[in-house]
A protein has these predicted regions:
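HTH-adjacent hinge/linker in prokaryotic transcriptional regulators
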Residues: 2-23, 27-101, 107-126, 131-133, ...
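Conserved phosphate- and dinucleotide-binding cores of soluble alpha/beta proteins
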Residues: 2-26, 30-34, 45, 115, ...
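Short, Lys/Arg- and Gly-enriched loop/turn segments at beta-strand edges
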Residues: 106-107, 222
């Protein structure tokens, strides 16, 4: 196991449990106590967790991990979701993508799609505020990239601020594919940063259809900043059926659900 993979797993454990001991991390990862101590100290130095006596704790519910530490989480689920989302895209479509690990995977699938890029296919237009998505797709001949204005956030590579809205004002897209940090009946689609929520909200406003791409860990939870009400979401693509209460909320809001098992 590489160090980066191990650090990702440590952060995932801390995020899920809130507080972990050195012994718990060692047992979960199958590594020595000395290795766990080094990893926890390194992550604490990077201000990604708080070191405690005999372990570590999460920084708080409002803290957002940088994108590079999220990539390994639910990776198989995100790949399955991305493939299902890509099936919704027809040649010639315009698609808005916000930032995040799930939408980045959607971008990769669209970028390698033979159905969209083969022969005389008209390709696809991607409108995004995510610098990593724009960079990755810029070499794809069948993809036209439109990047919004804005100020980049280091944690997510997303552009935020009033220039996002002004960039989108005169556009119209077939789909807005949104990655979220939470989806619930009461608060709708949410994310941890208000600037990213605003950018995603503007994307949804210029879309004929709003698609939320989210693994099952995001369902039934809410985070700091609201993107839109649940009723404004047309389709949810996820990896597992929602729990009964959440499924009822989705049905009441008229949200179509596509389950793409990993």
């Amino acid at each position: 196991m590489t160090q980066q993979r191990r650090l990702n797993l440590v952060l995932e454990l801390v995020s899920e449990r809130g507080t972990v001991s050195i012994a718990e991390v060692g047992d979960a990862l199958g590594v020595s106590t000395a290795t766990v101590r080094r990893d926890l100290n390194l992550l604490a130095e990077q201000r990604l967790l708080t070191r405690t006596h005999g372990g570590a704790s999460a920084l708080g519910s409002g803290y957002e991990l940088p994108l590079q530490y999220k990539i390994a989480r639910q990776s198989e689920a995100k790949t399955a979701i991305a493939r299902a989302v890509a099936e919704l895209v027809a040649p010639g479509d315009a698609v808005a993508l916000n930032g995040g690990t799930t939408t980045s995977e959607v971008a990769r699938v669209l970028g390698s799609s033979e159905a969209l890029g083969g022969g005389d296919a008209p390709g696809v237009t991607i409108v995004t505020n995510a610098l990593n998505i724009a960079f990755e797709l810029s070499v794809r001949e069948h993809v036209k990239i439109v990047v919004t204005g804005g100020v980049p956030r280091r944690q997510s590579y997303e552009l935020v601020g009033p220039l996002v809205a002004s960039s989108l004002r005169d556009l119209s897209v077939d789909l807005a594919v949104l990655g979220v940090d939470g989806l619930s009946g009461r608060f709708g689609a949410t994310t941890v940063h208000e600037g990213e929520a605003e950018a995603s909200r503007h994307m949804a406003a210029v879309a004929r259809r709003v698609v939320v791409a989210a693994d099952s860990t995001k369902l039934g939870r809410s985070t700091f900043a609201r993107i839109c009400a649940l009723e404004e979401v047309d389709l949810l693509v996820t990896d597992r059926p929602a729990e009964e209460a959440v499924a009822a909320e989705l049905a009441a809001a008229g949200v179509e659900v596509v389950v793409a098992p990993a």
